[in-house]
Amino acid sequence: DKSYFIFTNSIDLIYSIMTRLKVLDRSSVFCAPKSMDKLRQNKFIRCYDEWDKDNMRQYNFFTSRFFNAFDIELDVKPYLMMVTDVYFAEQTALDPFSDVIQIIGRFRNGVTSIEHITNVNYDLPQRSEEELCSFMDTSENVYETLRKFYDAAPNKGAREAYRAAMESLPFNRMLDRNGHKNWFAIDNYVNDALVIGYYHDNKSLHAAYL
């Protein structure tokens, strides 16, 4: 039988696919321990948190835990499929510039074919890198302005009010535990927003692949 390797970052979507296609008895899932617990609650036991080809079945599903940093060496060239459903689970959106390349790179002896099955959603925000950086700069300015008011607050009640306002701002998520700017978090925010934008329409996604 043909071997299929299917990558999608949603354990709920994986279980839905296996159920709808009636392949539960012919599938294995490679995922994080917490996801394994969820599958076992549904009486599915062929799930693993480490790759081992001895655990292969005809249909082999992988979450993002296995998108990189491990090699798949097989005597056969399987069919590679990547699945995105931006309505069901936005986290299944794959970056053609990184995720897709990393997934394909797992197969040291190549694959028979590569497919990315996806939908698009015109309601998803689509912003340029310049717009995202401008948003981040403005968010930082607003945060710093409130911090000045916080530092100059005349009493505890005022400080608590300013602190609550600061913690509600988008830029608060871009700080580390010491309150310093976290460049890694900022880069991730911008990149994730750009990737989601690719799935706004077919033309944008095709352009990202070219």
Q: Model segments located where?
A:
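Conserved strand-helix element at the start of the C-terminal RecA-like helicase core
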Residues: 1-22
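Conserved helicase motor
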Residues: 9-11, 28-48, 63-66
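Short acidic, S/G/P-rich loop/turn micro-motifs used as interaction or catalytic elements
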Residues: 11-14, 34-37, 65-70, 85-93, ...
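Short glycine-/polar-rich loops that comprise or flank the Walker A/P-loop
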Residues: 25, 75-78, 109-114
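Conserved two-lobed SF2 helicase motor
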Residues: 54-70
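A short beta-strand element within the Helicase C-terminal
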Residues: 71-85
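Conserved SF2 helicase motif VI
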Residues: 87-112
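The feature captures the C-terminal accessory region of ATP-dependent helicases
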Residues: 132-210
